């Protein structure tokens, strides 16, 4: 909660990047009367972005801010109700802006999928942000809004029915079309590089509760692997015949969901277990893909987290998409995702949440989700939680997002299943 009115409802920082431009385009369409400004290192490049946005954005002010110059971030944060940032990898560039927003009592939303960055943000700035009234909300894109909000919706459905707390909860990516942005790949490489160079970070990354506000208070529920391969019928009867394998974003998404549960005072339940997998179909080859794919994925992740530092950085950069690059508009329009999340409660009741969105998940869908998170923080303040500090999307604005996202083309429906 800011002490005095701010000049801007939202400042979009990183507007010249690929996803930054898409987010600016979305805000120009959906921002309504919100007072929006664009920010970046180069005034000329930001001006060029604004000129391409159409008439509604031509009066948006331009701010100059640079991650290497903390004073510019502080000045930007002091003028904004909310700062929305697409400038990553966040491990490398993110903490100075978190610091500026925490000090100024300014709400913040980003796209990070980097657990160690989030852990550092929590350790360094959670208390200060709570004291100043800032909401620092990480993972506001495809990772991890669909995962986080689906479970939050299931919790609401079970609570309204008086059906008890959530126990085994499994998210399955049923279908997915699209790629991962250059920025997302850069973030993944940053995670692996951090783990490779720092044994303590590698140990923390292996902890399913590494983002918990109180690690000692978390229940011991046995192994919770990040990249499991499972038969669908083990997850839910409705998935009989389907095989699943590990989902690449699960190591981040699962930790966000578990942090949400803890921030909400374990409202989902003390026996809440959460996993994510991706459907590989029901063909005769599906079991092979599930088992081999899962084994290879776990092996590659384990090796990369230890030895990626030995690869020449120039070689790595040549073989992965560059940050700021992405597919054509037509390709982005062809993308989509469909996820299903199944849960069983302590009373034996079963529920399903289906979430779907059109648009490439790493680009178009992410820009919509980030834009809506920024708008919720700025405009729906009476619907936000009372919590302050370093939060998750569900803990900070779960109710506001459940109300806001359908109008943005995001479908999320919960159903009670036969027990």
From Swiss-Prot:
GO CC, one annotated term: plasma membrane
Membrane topology: Single-pass membrane protein
SUPFAM superfamilies recorded: NAD(P)-binding Rossmann-fold domains (SSF51735)
Example of a GO MF term: oxidoreductase activity
Enzyme Commission number(s) from the entry: 1.3.1.-
PANTHER family associated with the record: SACCHAROPINE DEHYDROGENASE-LIKE OXIDOREDUCTASE
Protein name: Putative trans-acting enoyl reductase Rv2449c
């Amino acid at each position: 909660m800011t002490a005095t009115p701010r000049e801007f409802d939202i400042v979009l920082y990183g507007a010249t990047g690929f996803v930054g431009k898409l987010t600016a385009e979305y805000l120009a369409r959906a921002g309504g009367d919100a007072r929006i400004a664009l920010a970046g290192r180069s005034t000329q490049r930001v001006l060029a972005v604004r000129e391409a946005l159409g008439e509604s954005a031509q009066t948006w002010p331009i701010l100059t801010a640079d991650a290497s110059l903390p004073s510019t971030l502080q000045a930007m944060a002091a003028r904004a109700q909310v700062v929305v940032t697409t400038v990553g990898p966040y491990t490398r560039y993110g903490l100075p802006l978190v610091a500026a927003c925490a000090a100024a009592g300014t709400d913040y939303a980003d796209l990070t999928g980097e657990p160690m960055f989030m852990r550092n943000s929590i350790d360094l700035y959670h208390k200060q942000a709570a004291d100043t009234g800032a909401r620092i909300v990480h993972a506001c894109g495809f990772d991890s809004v669909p995962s986080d909000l689906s479970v939050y919706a299931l919790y609401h459905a079970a609570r309204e029915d008086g059906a008890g707390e959530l126990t085994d909860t499994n998210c399955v990516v049923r279908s997915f079309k699209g790629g991962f942005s250059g920025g997302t790949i850069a973030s993944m490489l940053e995670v692996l590089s951090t783990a490779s160079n720092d044994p303590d970070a590698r140990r923390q990354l292996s902890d399913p509760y590494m983002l918990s506000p109180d690690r000692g208070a978390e229940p011991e529920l046995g192994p919770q692997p990040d990249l499991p391969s499972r038969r669908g019928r083990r997850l839910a009867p409705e998935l009989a015949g389907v095989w699943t394998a590990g989902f690449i974003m699960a190591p981040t998404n699962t930790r966000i969901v578990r942090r949400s549960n803890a921030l909400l005072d374990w409202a989902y339940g003390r026996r809440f277990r959460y996993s994510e997998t991706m459907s590989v179909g029901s063909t005769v080859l599906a079991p092979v893909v599930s088992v081999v794919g899962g084994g290879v994925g776990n092996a590659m992740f384990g090796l990369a987290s230890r030895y990626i530092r030995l690869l020449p950085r120039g070689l790595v950069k040549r073989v992965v998409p560059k940050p700021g690059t992405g597919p054509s508009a037509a390709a982005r329009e062809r993308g989509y995702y469909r996820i299903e999340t199944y849960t069983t409660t302590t009373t034996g009741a079963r529920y399903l949440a289906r979430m779907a969105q059109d648009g490439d998940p790493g680009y178009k869908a992410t820009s919509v989700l980030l834009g809506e998170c920024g708008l919720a923080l700025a405009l729906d303040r009476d619907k936000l939680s009372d919590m302050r500090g370093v939060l998750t999307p569900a803990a900070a604005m779960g109710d506001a997002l459940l109300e806001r996202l359908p109008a943005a083309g995001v479908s999320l429906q919960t159903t009670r299943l036969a027990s």
